[in-house]
């Protein structure tokens, strides 16, 4: 029976909905549906690949978006391949860069890979995850094999990539070795005989190279699934340590809880879609309750507890909630406090205190901070240069002055 003849059953359609949830693109969807149908009919799991270059040892919630998708597909019974690009890391991925990315040393790669996988295992099921290193097949290629591989793809096709085109037009140098990165990543799919490859939206070109190379090597081409980049806690830029708008998965439960409670109500629903394992039906029902008048805080608490349970424990999640509520209770925050809407995030704390009428001047705000009299969401602050990203905050000055500040861009 050919792949096209396997029936698209209701179970296959349900699997396809899970794959599509929150994704940016699924190419080619009709092909992937047939792959799912074949897998259902034959009992042979699909080989689903996620390649990661361990360029940094720690990961945040933004990195887990694609890991969550891998876990969802893993739970459908498919084989998940967690590919560590120890070879390609020595080249340096130019994706989205305006300059050459420096390669890593073998020692850096080994350290980062161990730390990265240990954290990724909090999302993936280690018992059902195949770990591979692309040096297994890339190192033996040698010069002859590398040249033969390069002959499979043209410079014209390579220049279709936006960042290469931009750098070429603006006179920013492109090193020849940078062309090798997407080729080597594509060759990984050939070596692994991948049925589906996942990646961020910035990896689309590289994933398509893998699809084309599989055709060159006589294999059934993989489908590709790209996931969006998670917006950070500021509600503006993608989650990034450099932007200060990130939530690290190794942060303390209290820190994670506070940051998740600070995001805007609108952003909360995007986090539910990309970070929660709740069904879309459950999320829709919760949203309907909020729209009908239930406090959005209840939904944020549910989201925060789910995420903290995943990366710590249910007990830690309950304790983080208790600690969060205790900070407010001990601070004797009134039920009805003035609400202030401000625009211009990120905004300095001195400006926020002045604009919300909690302090008459910047000097008064500075003194209040130095004397330990300023709290944000129940936590005392000491940094007078603190910048607040977009979000909702409860500010307290002294024992009796409060304001709920909704800070927008």
UniProtKB/Swiss-Prot annotation:
Compartments in which it is found: Cytoplasm
Principal subcellular localisation of the protein: cytoplasm
HAMAP family in the cross-refs: Tyr_tRNA_synth_type2 (MF_02007)
Protein name: Tyrosine--tRNA ligase
Listed EC numbers: 6.1.1.1
GO molecular function: ATP binding; RNA binding; tyrosine-tRNA ligase activity
SUPFAM superfamilies assigned: Alpha-L RNA-binding motif, Nucleotidylyl transferase
Species the sequence originates in: Bordetella avium (strain 197N)
């Amino acid at each position: 029976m050919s792949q096209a003849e396997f029936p698209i059953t209701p179970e296959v359609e349900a699997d396809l909905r899970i794959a599509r949830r929150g994704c940016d693109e699924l190419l080619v969807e009709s092909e992937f549906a047939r792959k799912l149908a074949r897998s259902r009919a034959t009992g042979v799991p699909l080989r689903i690949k996620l390649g990661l270059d361990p360029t940094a040892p720690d990961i945040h919630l933004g990195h887990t978006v694609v890991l969550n998708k891998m876990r969802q597909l893993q739970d459908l019974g498919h084989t998940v391949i967690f590919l560590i690009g120890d070879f390609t890391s020595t080249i340096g991925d130019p994706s989205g860069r305006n300059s050459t990315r420096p390669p890593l040393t073998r020692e850096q790669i080994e350290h980062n890979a161990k730390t990265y996988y240990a954290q990724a295992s909090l999302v993936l099921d280690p018992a059902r995850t195949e770990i591979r290193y692309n040096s297994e097949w890339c190192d033996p290629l040698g010069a002859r094999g590398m040249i033969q591989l390069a002959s499979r793809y043209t410079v014209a096709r390579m220049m279709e990539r936006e960042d290469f085109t931009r750098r070429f037009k603006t006179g920013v140098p492109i090193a020849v070795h940078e062309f090798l990165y997407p080729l080597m990543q594509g060759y990984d799919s050939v070596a692994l005989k991948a049925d589906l490859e996942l990646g961020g939206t910035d990896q689309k070109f590289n994933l398509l190279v893998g699809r084309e190379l599989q055709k060159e090597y006589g294999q059934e081409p993989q489908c590709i699934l790209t996931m969006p980049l998670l917006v950070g806690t500021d509600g503006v830029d993608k989650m990034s340590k450099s932007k200060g708008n990130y939530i690290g998965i190794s942060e303390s439960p209290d820190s994670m809880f506070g940051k998740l409670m600070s995001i805007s109500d609108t952003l909360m629903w995007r986090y539910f879609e990309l970070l929660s394992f709740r069904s879309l039906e459950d999320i829709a029902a919760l949203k309907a309750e909020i729209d009908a008048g239930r406090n959005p805080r209840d939904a944020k608490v549910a989201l925060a507890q789910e995420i903290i349970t995943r990366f710590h424990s249910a007990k830690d999640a309950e304790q983080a909630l208790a600690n969060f509520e205790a900070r407010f209770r001990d601070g004797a925050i009134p039920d009805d406090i003035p609400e202030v809407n401000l625009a211009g995030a990120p905004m300095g704390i001195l400006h926020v205190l002045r604009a919300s009428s909690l302090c008459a001047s910047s000097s008064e705000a500075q003194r209040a901070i130095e004397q330990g009299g300023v709290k944000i969401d129940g936590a005392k602050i000491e940094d007078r240069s603190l910048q607040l990203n977009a979000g909702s905050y409860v500010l307290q000055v002294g024992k009796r002055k409060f304001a709920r500040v909704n800070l927008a861009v």
